[in-house]
A protein has these predicted regions:
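Sec-dependent N-terminal signal peptides
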Residues: 2-15, 102
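Thiol-/selenol-based redox modules, centered on thioredoxin-like
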Residues: 127-151
């Protein structure tokens, strides 16, 4: 019985922090590819959830893209950052996230299953380790990127 419960628990955890979505950012190295956390094996991943039509969410995507570029510029290639927006009417504002960014931009279809299964809220940032396991999450609504970056 313990083995069955362990398998069920593992399956729930794996399913909770998984998805299969297409990268819609033509500036991204994975543009047009189907992205899932398992694609980033052996890389720490940050998953940002936001609304493409909100200014603060768009600003956070820009800041995370700056962070991603700084990591790449310093040859830190074992960290990936992706942004996960929402489908439906939110998709009319996809260009807000795509312009001037090079990180993968993913869109959760109208049912928002990824947002729901992760328990994500607007401007939540989730961290998965290099094995795809959950590490931590927090909301970056009041995040002062410049203050953090310059420390």
């Amino acid at each position: 019985m313990k083995i069955i419960l362990s398998i069920l628990c593992f399956s729930y955890i794996f399913a909770q922090y998984d998805y299969i979505l297409e990268d819609i950012n033509p500036n991204s190295s994975t543009y047009g590819e189907i992205i899932a956390p398992s694609v980033f094996n052996n890389q720490v991943t940050l998953h940002y959830f936001g609304h493409q039509n909100w200014g603060t969410c768009t600003a956070r995507v820009g800041q995370l893209n700056d962070l991603y570029q700084d990591l790449l510029d310093n040859e830190i290639v074992n960290v990936r950052i992706v942004a996960i927006g929402k489908g439906g009417s939110y998709e009319n504002s996809n260009s807000n996230w795509i312009n001037n960014t090079s990180m993968p931009i993913l869109i959760d279809p109208v049912s928002y299953e990824v947002w729901e299964s992760w328990g994500a809220g607007q401007r939540d940032l989730y961290f998965l380790d290099s094995e795809g396991s959950y590490v931590n999450d927090f909301n970056i609504t009041s995040w002062n990127y410049n203050q953090i970056y310059n420390q």
